[in-house]
Amino acid sequence: MNRVLYPGTFDPITKGHGDLVERASRLFDHVIIAVAASPKKNPLFPLEQRVALAREVTKHLPNVEVIGFSSLLAHFAKEQGANVFLRGLRAVSDFEYEFQLANMNRQLAPDVESLFLTPSERYSFISSTLVREIAALGGDITKFVHPVVADALTERFKK
């Protein structure tokens, strides 16, 4: 069984992330969205909420599972029986970091391959950082995130 692990902070999950998950769900038997705790990034949403939002966004995909984790990614992949890491590349500027990450992961988990997918053109410019900034300033984010995520961001910035 081919199990792909799609790791990220997903703070928040965007339509770009959703696009990659949809496509991965057609390519692999099982997709695990691995939501990283990432405390050093100081996420806007707590881990539990990011997991819940990702589950809501992907609930229509029967072969997709969402799990939060705070361990080393290579160890988590082994625990989950994943044989592929999925990473998205929006632009050439993403490649250098992703290349380094793939090589490090290969050293730590030699049995897990890294697979890079580019997003659909309509999502190639979306990033969680930009979505958070637009939401914080009261801008319309409905084109970039699922309605449940837009509601969560609106609620978060009301405070």
Swiss-Prot record:
Q: What is its EC number?
A: 2.7.7.3
**Which is an annotated Pfam family here?**
CTP_transf_like
* Pathway of action: Cofactor biosynthesis; coenzyme A biosynthesis; CoA from (R)-pantothenate: step 4/5
Give GO cellular component annotations, separated by semicolons. Answer: cytoplasm
Tell me which residues bind substrate.
T9, K41, L73, R87
Does the keyword Nucleotide-binding feature in the UniProt annotation? yes
List, alphabetically, the InterPro entries matched: Cyt_trans-like (IPR004821), PPAT (IPR001980), Rossmann-like_a/b/a_fold (IPR014729)
Q: What does this protein do?
A: Reversibly transfers an adenylyl group from ATP to 4'-phosphopantetheine, yielding dephospho-CoA (dPCoA) and pyrophosphate.
Query: What NCBIfam families does this protein map onto?
Result: coaD_prev_kdtB, cyt_tran_rel
The identity of this protein, by name, is Phosphopantetheine adenylyltransferase
Organism, per UniProt? Answer: Pseudomonas putida (strain GB-1)
Species lineage, top-down?
Bacteria, Pseudomonadati, Pseudomonadota, Gammaproteobacteria, Pseudomonadales
Q: Which gene encodes it?
A: coaD
